Each structure stands twice: as C-alpha cells, then as structure tokens.
C-alpha cells in the first residue's frame, strides 16, 4: 500500500491537489465515502465466483473495524464478486442499505460501449448501451434500449447503408456480449490484473 500511495502521490502535481497516503482504519474516521477494494485478485482462468468464500471472509473481518470509525459514510464496493460482497456487507455491517452501493455492471457497460465504438469506429460518447444483471457471466445487454447517436442499435446498421451495400458487416450481438463478459479475464491473462478501467469507473 505504501508503494502504491507513493507512486500515485508523485503524480499529483499533474492533477487536482489531493492527499494520498497509506493509512489505518482510524484514518477513515468520519469519512463521507468509503470505497472497499479489499480481497484477493482473480488469477488467470478463475471466475469472480471462485473468489467468493475467501473474499466474503475478508469483508466480514474488516467490517467492524471500518464501520467503527465511519458509521455515517456511504460505502461503495468494487471487490469481486461485487454483488455477493455488497450483500454480505449489508447483512453484517448494520449500515442502512441506502448507504451501501456496489459498482455493479458499470465496468461491463464501459466494456460494451468500448467494443461498439471500436466496431463502428465512432466516439464512445456516442454509444448509449447498458449491461444489466450480475457483474459476471450472467450479465446481459437489453439491446432494445441501446442506441448509437440516438439511432436504435437495431436500426443503426441500416442507417449506414450506401449504394454499394453495408459499410460494415452486421453486428453479431452474441459475439459482443461474449467479448464483454470475457474482457476482464483477457486483461488478467495478459497483464495479471485489471487496474485502470475499473479505477476510472469508480
């Protein structure tokens, strides 16, 4: 933690001023927001659910320590499996559910939008599509509400037609969802862990 804090702190001169340091539970005293990232990381070939029991035990062990100093904070969970850990904290912390959040499928949504923007070669900010459900293999995309530049996703391909036919081959929804679900594992296989996209999403 000290090494991470030092690395980030040395980049603060390029950002909005803030204090970054490795601390203790007591340093969270009277915090407005507490972000929980505790837990072991996925290894290549593991699913998020493979981490469940170990990370549930970790959350149960840290909960009394953190809630002691920040009983009025809003808690945001990022650790995997995020849905299970968020639920665990709800049950064992005594904190009102209205102040407990999980990152849910926000990262899955970002990965979906990134893939669609790559496919259609457009700015990601013009892609409006969402992933619902569990942050994991059972997540799904409600394509009926997806749109690209205010054009429904299922009509966007037709909008790209020209006299020579389609500019880009028709999108395979199943392939896109498969890409989205496997993105985390693909990053882990290549570099060992995911850091940047999930950090930005929070």
Language model region names:
Residues 32-35:
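N-terminal Rossmann-like NAD(P) cofactor-binding module of classical short-chain dehydrogenase/reductase
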Residues 93-99, 108-202:
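C-terminal substrate-binding/catalytic lobe of Rossmann-fold NAD(P)-dependent dehydrogenases
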Residues 47-114:
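Rossmann-like NAD(P)(H) cofactor-binding subdomain of soluble oxidoreductases
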Residues 42-44:
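N-terminal glycine-rich phosphate/adenylate-binding segment common to multiple enzyme folds
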